[in-house]
Amino acid sequence: MMKKIDVKIVDPRVGQQFPLPTYATPGSAGLDLRACLDQAIELKAGETTLIPTGLAIHIADTGLAAVILPRSGLGHKHGVVLGNLVGLIDSDYQGQLMVSVWNRGQQTFTVEPGERIAQMVFVPVVQAEFNLVEDFVSSERGEGGFGHSGRS
């Protein structure tokens, strides 16, 4: 299913010097977000910084949200992940997309202008209305918590 989302370019290099986000393959769930930087920045081990993407989006559909996720290669090969682990973009947000990048690795990592630093996935949203009850209808699991369902 394809859904149109309003995108505003807030840095004129996006679409010129830096490509617009696209799906890499027909089966891709995520769009890559790029570092919209004037010059490379060095992220020392343990440091976190906020990186602009040069884009603002307005989803405008309360049935959708976007999540910003780490790119698997950056995390696995370099220890570079998101500072907030997952970013949530609400449907009514209209500001620039910023990516909190955290170097949890042991080596300094250089983020180059235009480098793909995160990915954005659009997800359906269900807003819940709470129904207060005294007790729940019994289930097989009940109150079993962490690890209760086993490993095999």
Curated annotation (Swiss-Prot):
**Keywords assigned by UniProt, alphabetized:** Hydrolase, Magnesium, Metal-binding, Nucleotide metabolism
Q: InterPro entries, alphabetically?
A: dUTPase, dUTPase-like, dUTPase-like_sf, dUTPase_trimeric
EC id: 3.6.1.23
Q: What GO terms in the biological process aspect are recorded for it?
A: dUMP biosynthetic process; dUTP catabolic process
* Coiled-coil positions: none
Listed cofactors: Mg(2+)
Key word Metal-binding present: yes
Q: Where does substrate bind?
A: R71, S72, G73, N84, L88, I89, D90, M98
Q: Name one GO molecular function term.
A: dUTP diphosphatase activity
**SUPFAM superfamilies membership:** dUTPase-like (SSF51283)
Identify the enzyme class. Answer: hydrolase
User: Looking at the keywords, is Magnesium present?
Assistant: yes
Organism's domain of life?
Answer: Bacteria
Please list the reactions this protein catalyses: dUTP + H2O = dUMP + diphosphate + H(+)
Pathway membership of this protein?
Answer: Pyrimidine metabolism; dUMP biosynthesis; dUMP from dCTP (dUTP route): step 2/2
Q: Which family does it belong to?
A: Belongs to the dUTPase family.
- Protein function: This enzyme is involved in nucleotide metabolism: it produces dUMP, the immediate precursor of thymidine nucleotides and it decreases the intracellular concentration of dUTP so that uracil cannot be incorporated into DNA.
Q: What is this protein called?
A: Deoxyuridine 5'-triphosphate nucleotidohydrolase
The scientific name of the source species is Pectobacterium carotovorum subsp. carotovorum (strain PC1)
**UniProt gene name:** dut
